[in-house]
Amino acid sequence: PSGLALDFGAAPGGWTRVLRGYGLRVVAIDPAMLDPRVARDPGVTHFKGTTQEYMRQGERCDVIVNDMRMDAMLSCQIMGEAAGILKPEGLAIMTLKLPHENQQRNARRAMDLLSKWYEIPFARQLFHNRSEVTVLLRPKRRWAAD
């Protein structure tokens, strides 16, 4: 990938470092502080606000990573809004944070909601953290930013 990546819930900056390793410019979106090594990177812009505040600017992007610590359904709603700024050929990686009870049902509900805006070519529950599911998303044509 090339171009601009958005890192939702970026602090302390793990995903931002990965994205920079692929040569992407990154807007790290989080009210919390970034690791100083990440913050000093000239290819990183730290937006110290919420994802919703940032998206109001309407800047289109090539990649979105969402690792926000919040209710999975709320995070999915935010990804629905983000479909409007993700370029048609773009991709998103999202981590669903699931409560311990009813994980399978909650994961299914979240993916059903995401499928309104995205194709879901891949989803995997991580072995080391059974309460998270990582999902790869591609925007459906009608939602993507042209």
Predicted regions and their residues:
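S-adenosyl-L-methionine
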Residues: 25-66, 71-74
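Local beta-strand N-terminus motif with an aromatic residue
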Residues: 2, 60-61, 89
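C-terminal substrate-binding/active-site "lid" region of AdoMet-derived donor-dependent transferases
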Residues: 76-143
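Redox-cofactor binding/interface segments in oxidoreductases and associated redox assembly factors
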Residues: 7, 65-66, 94
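A generic alpha-to-beta junction signature in SAM-dependent methyltransferases
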Residues: 20, 64, 85-88
